[in-house]
């Protein structure tokens, strides 16, 4: 509040009432993606206060209230909102395919955040996986075509190691798998899709359907712990906007890392929907928790299905090891 008062005096602005101060603090906390910390970027705060002052004077008010700050913040967003609207329109017109209901095997709704200067917005992305008999390699299609960055490639390697360590400690993993961000035509960077990618892989291997009414974001370590990511508020709101536009079912929502529970600074509209049970924000601290939320199956059932499929692929691998190229029993020429 001291910085707010300093900027107010420096710019000769109207005083703020308690509601106005609270709204500015909320805005600053959202910019930091942390409800326990505030952004001290003077330029942004100065712009917000100046716009709020203009709105208050236009309304004939003697103080800047919460409604003036809210209007200023929304106006700043609206000026760049055409990019978000165009992106979301592609999903709503089904040009970009993203399901928000039903189930699908090997398909998960990931969440991405797009940055345009100081403006950012979230959008769901369809991530798919396939699994078949092979030599244990997880193919990162984004990397193969030079669309995947180094951090994303590292994340896929961590997923591969986690998968092998979990289901094939004492023998080679007898499968080949592939991962891809569908309908993505630009570079992919970051590790925030790690949870979504591993869930898609396990779903494809075990033939277990994933709830498409949920989206997920989160990084992973080799022990299966879900780690923090960036842009959590924008990602939640991006999926919420799509669900709302299509008509909320009451079962839609997002899964985020547990570490972000204190970082949420969501729009009031989203908070109201959560309070009314129309939208849900779940947290997961481990891949086990994420799997159970996204599939509705117990982790014991999921692991049993994966191990059964791995055992089946091992039997197939052994049967092929004695076959020639044409599938006939190999023999010496003697």
Where does each model-flagged region fall?
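Conserved AAA+ ATPase core "coupling" helix
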Residues: 1-9, 23, 292-295
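Conserved phosphate/pyrophosphate-binding and hydrolysis machinery centered on Walker-type P-loop NTPases
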Residues: 14-21, 35-46, 62-66, 145-149, ...
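Core mixed alpha/beta domains of very large multi-subunit molecular machines
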Residues: 71-72, 78-149, 160
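Non-catalytic, well-ordered alpha-helical scaffold segments
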Residues: 22, 43-46, 50, 67, ...
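Peripheral, non-AAA+ core regions of ATP-driven protein-machinery
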Residues: 93-96, 125, 131-147, 151-334
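C-terminal helical "lid" subdomain and adjoining coupling/linker elements of P-loop NTPases
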Residues: 10-16, 29-100, 317-324
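Conserved helix-loop functional segments at active or binding sites
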Residues: 6-13, 26-34, 54, 58, ...
């Amino acid at each position: 509040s001291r910085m707010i008062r300093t900027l107010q005096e420096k710019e000769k602005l109207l005083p703020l009432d308690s509601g106005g101060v609270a709204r500015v603090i909320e805005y600053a906390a959202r910019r930091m993606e942390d409800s326990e910390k505030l952004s001290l970027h003077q330029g942004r705060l100065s712009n917000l206060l100046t716009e709020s002052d203009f709105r208050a004077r236009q309304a004939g008010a003697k103080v800047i209230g919460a409604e003036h700050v809210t209007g200023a913040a929304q106006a700043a967003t609206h000026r760049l909102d055409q990019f978000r609207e165009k992106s979301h329109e592609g999903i709503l017109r089904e040009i970009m395919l993203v399901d928000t209901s039903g189930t699908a095997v090997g398909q998960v709704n990931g969440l991405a955040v797009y940055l345009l200067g100081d403006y950012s917005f979230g959008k769901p992305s369809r991530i798919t996986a396939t699994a078949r008999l092979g030599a244990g390699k997880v193919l990162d299609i984004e990397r193969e075509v030079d669309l995947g960055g180094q951090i994303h490639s590292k994340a896929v390697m961590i997923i591969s190691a986690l998968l092998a360590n979990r289901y094939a400690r004492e023998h080679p993993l007898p499968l080949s798998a592939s991962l891809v961000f569908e309908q993505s035509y630009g570079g992919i960077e970051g590790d925030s899709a790690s949870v979504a990618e591993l869930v898609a892989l396990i779903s494809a291997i075990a033939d277990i359907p994933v709830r498409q009414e949920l989206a997920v974001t989160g990084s992973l370590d080799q022990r299966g712990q879900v780690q923090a990511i960036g842009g959590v508020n924008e990602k939640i709101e991006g999926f919420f906007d799509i669900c709302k536009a299509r008509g909320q079912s009451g079962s839609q929502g997002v899964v985020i890392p547990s570490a972000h529970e204190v970082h949420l600074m969501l729009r009031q509209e989203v908070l109201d929907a959560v309070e009314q049970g129309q939208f849900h924000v779940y947290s997961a601290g481990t891949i086990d928790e994420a799997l159970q939320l996204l599939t509705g199956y117990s982790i014991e059932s999921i692991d049993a299905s994966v191990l059964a499929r791995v055992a089946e692929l091992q039997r197939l691998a052994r049967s092929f090891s004695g076959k020639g190229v044409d599938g006939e029993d190999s023999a010496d020429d003697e």
